[in-house]
């Protein structure tokens, strides 16, 4: 367990946004399903992305890390056709995206697949897939509360009805898989679709690799079978969910300029810009992708987090220092992330002096003038909680003690390097200091 003592003080300087984790998952999968050689540039080797790389290796892709790119030989190439093992183990580590994307993909191959993982991953629901397996006679067994899932059987084309309000990862997993089946398929969304931005990223990546899918207003997706992922060179754009930490730092009087962001991005977490503007920030777009921030007193608002769940922890920090009451609604899904994020946000920010009321599907946040600090806080072993608390420390009256900071490696391994380069002041802390 690593512990940092982090001191107050504003951040100042320029930071390069780390590559998008969401796009990297999708780029690696599409390239690995391809028919030749792809080169993926600007990729961040976080724990989650390494899990997806290793998972696609387990399915037969040949993937090597070069100096400036990831070299991927797709499973449909002649070199890889006999590379897959009949009985394979796919280690997802703690990556929910890896698990939910790869479960249906694994069902296009003969033999059996065993999925294992760590942390909270065994608590992530997979009932959507179990229903499909039961309907198609695909054998599966699992241990409740622990990720040890075994699957044997071939997925067949057809019509699939999926809820849109559980996780878009199930929909993406099926969309990746169905074009490779022999016949045509249809995916019907039976409820309002949350996290549309993630579906847009999936469809965009698949289109970039030559796959065609008809999207009928996010209510149904028509997928032709017997398609081929066409290998290509691919660059991962900057990650808005990570840029959000420094945008909020700017809202709290830091002076950080964030570059390498695609201002036309399809990322759902780009909504951080619109949310902060509603909270009375002025955000300036610079030609090279920088976002310059001019700060004003923050105002309260109502935030629907259904389309951008990953930025809710750090947005909650900004709301804690707004004038008035902010309501963050439709965020019940955050309870089944790396931790119960609603509970973690409320408990840890309240320790610092915030005033947050946690409800089943929402957070009610009454703004305060200052955060006191001077206490020990815990990341809950969740990367987004750890980074949010680090940003919170910059405006506290006293230093904070942050426990379990290493979890940042899940998505942004260089976060504290960037934090330090911007003037962040912290050091390892030992009990009794």
Swiss-Prot record:
GO biological process per UniProt: amino acid biosynthetic process; aromatic amino acid family biosynthetic process; chorismate biosynthetic process
Pathway: Metabolic intermediate biosynthesis; chorismate biosynthesis; chorismate from D-erythrose 4-phosphate and phosphoenolpyruvate: step 6/7
Binding-site positions, 3-phosphoshikimate: 21-22, 26, 167-169, 195, 310, 337
Gene Ontology MF term list: 3-phosphoshikimate 1-carboxyvinyltransferase activity
Residues the entry annotates as binding phosphoenolpyruvate: 21, 96, 124, 169, 341, 384, 410
Source organism superkingdom: Bacteria
Subcellular location: Cytoplasm
Record's keyword terms, sorted: Amino-acid biosynthesis, Aromatic amino acid biosynthesis, Cytoplasm, Transferase
Keyword Iron-sulfur: no
A single Gene Ontology CC term: cytoplasm
Subunit structure, interactors included: Monomer.
Recorded family membership: Belongs to the EPSP synthase family.
Function: Catalyzes the transfer of the enolpyruvyl moiety of phosphoenolpyruvate (PEP) to the 5-hydroxyl of shikimate-3-phosphate (S3P) to produce enolpyruvyl shikimate-3-phosphate and inorganic phosphate.
Name assigned to this protein: 3-phosphoshikimate 1-carboxyvinyltransferase
Source taxonomy: Bacteria, Bacillati, Bacillota, Clostridia, Eubacteriales
Gene behind the chain: aroA
């Amino acid at each position: 367990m690593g512990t940092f003592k982090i001191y107050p003080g504003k951040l100042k300087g320029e930071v390069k946004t780390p590559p998008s984790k969401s796009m990297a998952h999708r780029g690696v999968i599409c390239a690995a399903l391809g028919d030749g050689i792809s080169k993926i540039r600007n990729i961040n080797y976080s724990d989650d992305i390494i899990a997806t790389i290793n998972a696609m290796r387990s399915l037969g892709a040949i993937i090597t890390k070069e100096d400036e790119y990831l070299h991927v030989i797709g499973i449909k190439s002649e070199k890889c056709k006999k590379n897959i093992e009949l009985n394979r183990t796919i280690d997802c580590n703690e990556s929910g995206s890896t698990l939910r994307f790869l479960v249906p993909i694994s069902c296009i191959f003969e033999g059996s697949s065993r999925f294992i993982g760590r942390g909270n991953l065994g608590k992530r629901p997979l009932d959507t897939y179990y229903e499909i397996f039961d309907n198609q006679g695909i054998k599966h067994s699992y241990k409740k509360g622990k990720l040890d899932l075994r699957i044997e059987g071939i997925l067949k084309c057809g019509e699939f009805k999926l809820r849109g309000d559980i996780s878009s990862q199930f929909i993406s997993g099926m969309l990746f898989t169905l074009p490779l089946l022999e016949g045509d398929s249809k995916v019907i969304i039976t409820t309002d679709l949350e996290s549309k931005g993630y579906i847009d990223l999936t469809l965009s990546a698949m289109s970039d690799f030559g796959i065609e899918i008809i999207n009928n207003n996010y209510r149904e997706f028509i997928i032709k079978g017997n398609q081929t992922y066409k290998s290509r060179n691919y660059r991962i754009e900057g990650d808005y969910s990570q840029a959000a930490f420094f945008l909020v730092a700017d809202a709290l009087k830091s002076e950080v300029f964030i570059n390498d962001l695609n201002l036309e991005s399809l990322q759902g977490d780009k909504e951080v810009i619109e949310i902060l503007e509603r909270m009375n920030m002025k955000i300036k777009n610079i030609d090279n992708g920088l976002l310059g921030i001019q700060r004003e007193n923050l105002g309260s608002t109502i935030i629907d987090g259904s389309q951008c769940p990953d930025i809710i922890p750090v947005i909650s920090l900004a709301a804690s220092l707004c004038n008035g009451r902010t309501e963050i609604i439709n965020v019940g899904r955050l309870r089944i992330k790396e931790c119960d994020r609603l509970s973690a946000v409320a408990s840890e920010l309240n320790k610092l002096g915030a005033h947050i009321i946690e409800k089943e599907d929402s957070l009610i946040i009454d703004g305060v003038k200052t955060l006191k600090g001077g206490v020990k806080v815990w990341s809950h072993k969740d990367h987004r909680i750890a980074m949010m608390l680090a940003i919170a420390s910059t405006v506290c009256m006293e230093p904070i003690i942050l426990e379990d900071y290493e979890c940042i490696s899940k998505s942004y391994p260089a976060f504290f390097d960037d934090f330090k380069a911007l003037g962040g002041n912290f050091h390892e802390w030992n009990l009794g200091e």
